[in-house]
Amino acid sequence: MFESGAVVAAALGAAGASLEPAQTQPNGVDLTVGAVFTQTSRGRIGRDGKHVGDRTKLEPDDGWYQLEAGTYVVRYGEPVRIPTDHVGFVLPRSTLLRNGCTLDTAVWDAGYEGVGEGRLDVGHGIDIEAGARIGQLVLARADHEGTYDGTYQGENR
């Protein structure tokens, strides 16, 4: 079962997030654009390890990211802490979808802490203001063995 937006907001508050009242929704919390990147070199995913390719951070023009069609990495503006008895998912806000764009993210495991990232696919050029709400974090109760202890723990803090 998914939790209420108030439960998600409390989890983010415990991670140090300063949320605006409008970010708390009935079933989750809106995440904002903290930074946007383009990937500039190949990454590597092998059986024995991984490497994320180099990136270039885009600078907003007068507070706005003017994005052409393509794939970007977005870093969210809020620190996140997934409670140990939950799993997190980030879904795109409907206005993003209605403008031909989407967000892709992986499962956010129980115990993950950090300032997460996702893939922003822009199907047609769009202007996105820095700090704009683009995704919604939802939490669901989950049974599991252990908590997240991977290489991305504490990322971007």
Regions found by a protein language model. Give the residues of each.
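DUTPase catalytic domain/fold
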Residues: 1-157
